[in-house]
Amino acid sequence: MANGAHHARILDPALIVKTVERLRARISERFPDSGLAAVAADLTETAQATAARVQNLSRPYVGLRLLALLAVIAGIAAQIYVARLIDWADVLRRADPVGITQGLDSIVNLLLLAFAAIWFVLTLEQRLKRRRVQRRLYELRSFAHVIDMHQLTKDPTAVLSGSAPTPSSPERRMSKFELSRYLDYCAEMLALIAKLAALYAGQTRDSEVIASVNEVEELTSNLGRKIWQKIMILSELDEKRARIPAPQPTASET
């Protein structure tokens, strides 16, 4: 029971991929050969790759860990070997206090350098994983901006008002229903991008990775909020137009 509750609190990469694939099918059926359908296809491939990468991210780099262990053992062994070569009794007998102090200072510096090298090797796996995740999160951020560009010229007021376009106006061939579905698809894709980013946060405790994931989630939330504002405007304008009474026939027309 407790194990099931634990899994219920974890995002399932397979379910997210299925949701993205279903959304791609919906967009392709509603808007075939559109730019948004192409973006949805690319997002599907990215979602599938993300699911595989997240699984690999949780696995240890065995070779790198063995190398780190060997480096640590070699560093400790080298320190012990050098220490055993020194006749400390003879050093204390012959050296003056200043010489002893200088010698101890050199030994401390060597130890600090050795520990710094060991720390570098031990954290190498974490830094490699962080670099890879940051690169993938940058890719998701780019997707979010591409989706925002697709909805940028979709103006609900222009669709309902029927105003005459200028020569530089973007093409507006969508009906009210199509525009509503288009904007809704954009909002769904942004939400799924946030979920894909959250998959990386679920596999690491790296503060930098978690901060980058939060940035992606904040970006998609802000862009999605703009889209939902357009959807609300579209709905409100449509309701206002529906409330306008139809013109009554004049006496000459009756």
How would you label these PLM feature ranges?
Residues 4-8, 28-39, 55-66, 96-103, ...:
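Non-transmembrane, amphipathic alpha-helical segments
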Residues 14, 21, 41-48, 134, ...:
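Generic structural signal for well-ordered, non-transmembrane alpha-helical segments
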Residues 22-26, 95, 115-124, 165-174, ...:
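Short, charged/polar, low-complexity loop and linker segments
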Residues 27-30, 50, 54-57, 147-154, ...:
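Secondary-structure edge/capping motif, primarily at the C-terminal ends of alpha-helices
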Residues 131-176, 232:
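Solvent-exposed, non-transmembrane helices and loops of integral membrane proteins
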Residues 192-254:
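Cytosol-/stroma-facing membrane-proximal "stalk/adaptor" domains immediately downstream
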